[in-house]
Amino acid sequence: MTSHFSSLPAHRSYIFSLYRDVLRNIHRCCYSVELQNILTSKLNLTMKQQKGTMSSWKAHSKIKELEELNDRLINRDLPYLKELINNLSGNKINSTQPNQYVQDLKEATNLINEYHSNNSQSIETIKKMDILNRYIKTKQSKHLLPKEISNVYKESLLLPFAIHEDSIYKLNKLHNQLIRGPPRVRLTNTKAGKITIWFLRSALNKKDRQSKKLKLRIAKEKQKHQQRIDNIKTCEKYAYWALLEASWESLLNTGKLPTININKTINNLSTLDNEDININRKNNHHIKDIHVKEWIEPITYSIKQLVDKEFERKCHYENYKKIILYGKNNGLIDFFENKTKVMYARRVSRYKTVVNGLPFIIPTIPRRDLRTALLDNKVLLP
């Protein structure tokens, strides 16, 4: 029998990653809130509709559309988004009865597109203008520049010095980071109830470089823990009614009510401490009333299984910390420390290369300025 795409880990991982990227880029690259809402709702509707798709060709085409949408969002290709609003769900909007909401969106899109076509600037130019504006404001606040400056002087005279000063600031910032030594590798954790999930933090796996598997593992562990808590609460509710039924059955058969404290029994069953559970297991054998024992044993068994699973996961992460993270020769900690030292040595080498070339830096000559030296030596990202 043909397996569904959801049973393929590689497919699931890629789709989830791409889906998150598209959602992130919709809010990052679209300045219109209405456009964000339409794209988000259409995307969620399409993902829901195509969830049960078994056709490989159809799944392939939809993935390509999603990849194209992501690329268009990154490039801010606003005219294309108008067509993709219809294509994502596969349902064309009836042109004979156009939606007023869509018409307003088209007009807004045309205005935005017209504005960008008349005021198109590269990202590099925008960055340089931002540096220049900050430089001028700083100098004017110190009364080192006049309030009115010609645009010709700004671009031809002040811009090279603004970029040079900004590059010096970034070089000094890097120097302050390097004198502190290699970045630390530290052991940290997060909690899921009494389960302590241990993992490593270093300069190599922080922010965007953090392992997606680690995120999924933590989220899944917390979700499973909450499910066990909810199941135990459900067992408590059933235990209350089971004890009442057992008391009633015992009264019918023997004419006497069993001497049992319902609230105390439920509290003993629902505790999450494994040592207490072991004590309660011994106490459960002392329940003399056969009717109470018959009614309460299935619920007791279910709660024991849930608590044992909780304790098992707790031990699993403790062993993971001892064997994998520390382990022989410090395990993963030693591995990340070595990798971090190699990365630090490369950064020091690049920094020294830039510093050795400082006597030859001329801010006003293209390709001889400090910013170019930082970019060429990969000290500064473009």
UniProtKB/Swiss-Prot annotation:
Entry similarity comment: Belongs to the RRG1 family.
Keywords for the protein's UniProt record, in alphabetical order: Mitochondrion
Upper taxonomic lineage: Eukaryota, Fungi, Dikarya, Ascomycota, Saccharomycotina
Main function: Essential for respiratory growth and required for mitochondrial protein synthesis. Required for vacuolar acidification.
Main subcellular location of this protein, as a coarse class: mitochondrion
UniProt key word Mitochondrion: yes
Superkingdom, natural source: Eukaryota
The name this protein goes by in its record: Required for respiratory growth protein 1, mitochondrial
Record has Manganese as a keyword: no
Organism: Vanderwaltozyma polyspora (strain ATCC 22028 / DSM 70294 / BCRC 21397 / CBS 2163 / NBRC 10782 / NRRL Y-8283 / UCD 57-17)
Disulphide bond pairs: none
GO biological process, alphabetically ordered: mitochondrial genome maintenance; mitochondrial tRNA 5'-end processing; vacuolar acidification
Location in or out of the cell: Mitochondrion
GO cellular component: matrix side of mitochondrial inner membrane
